[in-house]
Design a protein with these regions (language model features):
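Nucleotide/phosphate-binding catalytic cleft detector across ATP-hydrolyzing
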Residues: 1-160, 168-286, 293-342
Length: 342
């Protein structure tokens, strides 16, 4: 792997998620997330906007403009859209007109298949990358949290992202046990949206559903104190704009089944973990990352249900990108886990 020595000032760590894309660049550090959303003209195929700007256009555009997410459940479903998104964000982060060929280190779920690898390579080529390397997300997370020196003791990471949940146990030898599921922040948003529609006969958008999830989700099982948040939508009956008050019990009913599926997956992974690592995990706790890990009281809820201490990492939405950007510092430890695409 002679290419390793060539990495340097133009290394870019990339975490492309279903909800957001985050970059970590050697020359400027963390590049805060842009939404993984694109706007395209249905007739001409021309891309009109990306990121937060495209997301803000959702529900406000004429029928010929399509707003979409090129990633679904942590996999590329729109190659061209992903290439446009990645290319736009990388180039925006450099000086206008600057000619460069970056080297990309991209986070991927454990067990990515050949089709998905090819899709990532095509997206990287569109950016002009002269080298592309894949790193498993759990390993990137360990590096992003600064835990690489403690891996030999056993580390459990629960990554509850926008499109999937990844649960991993790592040791000095790499990933020991892992599990991928489609329960995610996005499925919670859909459940909230459907609950409001069925219970109140109101249609709300995904942004409103996410706001309700953040305001009222997770901590219901800890304090048992009912809470209320207001939201706006369109009445299914009259078609007019209305404002309603939604309760924490409503949100609990919506997202509980999803949370408890995640908890079941955590238990299953613990049951498959070698006994030599379990004591360390129980002592050091479960590390939580991903956007949905930030729901109020989620760490305490997991601690209570699973019986193992859990805590949310600093900047949990960004640790994968930071870890990818610094991966080459630990090349001797993780050489076998880095996949050279070209």
């Amino acid at each position: 792997m002679d290419w390793i020595g060539s990495f340097g000032s133009e290394d870019i760590g990339v975490d492309i998620g279903t909800s957001n894309i985050v970059l970590f660049m050697k020359h400027k550090g963390l590049v805060f997330p842009e939404a993984s959303v694109i706007a395209r003209n249905r007739m001409s195929g021309e891309y009109l906007a990306y990121g937060t700007r495209a997301e803000e256009m959702e529900g406000k555009t004429p029928s010929e403009i399509v707003i979409s997410r090129p990633m679904k459940e942590s996999a590329i479903v729109d190659y061209n859209g992903t290439a446009f998104l990645l290319n736009s964000i990388v180039n925006k982060s450099y000086l206008k007109g600057m000619f460069f060929h970056p080297r990309l280190i991209m986070c991927v779920p454990k067990g990515i298949n050949s089709v998905q690898r090819r899709a990532l390579l095509e997206a990287a080529v569109a950016v002009g990358a002269r080298k592309t390397v894949l790193i498993d997300q759990p390993l990137a997370a360990v590096m992003g949290m600064g835990l690489e020196n403690h891996q030999q003791e056993g580390t459990m990471i629960v990554d509850i992202g926008g499109g999937s949940t990844k649960i991993s146990v790592l040791s000095k030898k790499g990933i020991v046990v892992s599990h991928f599921s489609t329960e995610s922040g996005s499925t919670m948003d859909t459940a909230v949206l459907n609950t409001v529609r069925d219970r109140y006969h109101i249609r709300i958008g995904r942004k409103e559903a996410e706001s309700l999830k953040i305001a009222l989700g997770a901590s219901w099982d800890l304090d048992r104190q009912p809470r209320i948040a207001e939201t706006s939508g369109l009445s299914i009956v009259s078609g007019l704009p209305v404002k309603i008050a939604v309760t924490s019990e409503d949100i609990a009913g919506a997202i509980n089944p999803i949370l408890y599926k995640i908890f079941t997956h955590i238990r299953d992974v613990l049951q498959r973990t070698p006994p030599a690592l379990l004591a360390s995990i129980r002592e050091n706790g479960i590390m939580m990352i991903g956007g949905a890990s930030q729901l109020k009281g989620m760490d305490d809820l997991i601690s209570k249900v699973i019986g193992v201490p859990a805590r949310v990492a600093d900047r949990p939405s960004y640790v994968n990108a930071v870890g990818a950007g610094s991966a080459l510092n630990y090349i001797n430890d993780f050489r076998d886990s880095l996949q050279d695409l070209h």
